[in-house]
Amino acid sequence: MAAAIPASIDEVTAQWMSDATGWNVTAVRNEIIGVGVGVSSAVYRSHLTGSGCPTSVIVKLPALDPNAVFTSAVLRMYIREVKFFKTLAKDVPFRVSQSYYGEVNEETSQFAMVVEDLGSLRIVDQVKGMAIDDARRAVDGVAAMHAKWWGKADALAADGTTISLGDPIYPAVVPMVFAEGWEKCTKEIKMPDSIMQVGPRFGAAVAPLLSSLAQGPNTLAHGDYRADNILFGNDDELVVLYFQLIGTGIGAYDLAYFITQSISADDARRYEREQFDRWIQGLLSRGAPKDLVDKKALW
């Protein structure tokens, strides 16, 4: 029987870690990682002493902010991540953290995960933007994932492993979250006129925009594919993190989100078409049915 889900980091003790992982852990020292690093989750590094165990692991628990927990629970974010590691992680075509423990109460959304500590890998500063060679590797990786489930991902939403990007829960929640963030940003930052023309009207446009993201052929979408959730290992091996927004929808969403969020504006203008063409070629070379890859519609 799996170890009980801890109510807080204070319950992540040596005994709990031993029960959860099967290791012989004699001491645990927990430290929160950063401030504002985990928005939907509280993220900790647990330093371990014992035998047959790594020196450190990452522990994820619900966020410390009750509002963030509420939003995450409504969107089934904790449920999605636990289900991903239990059912899909072994099949994705890139490296992910090894999961040592993952449980969620689907009624309360209380959850806990213990995963591999990948803190030694190379990170990318999303503010500066990802170098184009790294971006190409990231596009190749997401294309391979999309190809594997191209035209076949509706079943994942049907069984609750993912949520469709067109699910009614998104337009019920996202405009509220956006409005809160928009108010804070406009109070603190002077927005360009071009942004001010769009921002006040964006919330009302969310529903039709999201609906369009599920008008197939659908695939497995990461949902938050950007530099902050990507690492690079030895020989520039692609490593992808964070699967709380895993969804079913059109793969072009992941690509557009990545290009607009993870490379500089200059590189986006210069390489946008190249990256799109690379993604299309990746889909086809990895087995996505040619008759289901409409390049014109996806662009």
Predicted regions and their residues:
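Conserved NTP-binding catalytic cores of kinases and kinase-like/nucleotidyltransferase enzymes
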Residues: 1-110, 233-238
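Helix-rich C-terminal or lid/interface subdomains of diverse kinases
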Residues: 136, 281-299
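Conserved short submotifs of the Hanks-type protein kinase catalytic core
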Residues: 108-121
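Glycine- and acidic
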Residues: 67-71, 123-128, 241, 258-265
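Active-site activation/catalytic loop segments of kinase-like enzymes and analogous catalytic loops
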Residues: 83, 87, 245, 251-288
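Active-site acidic catalytic loop and adjacent metal/ATP-binding pocket
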Residues: 37-48, 52-53, 57-58, 205-251
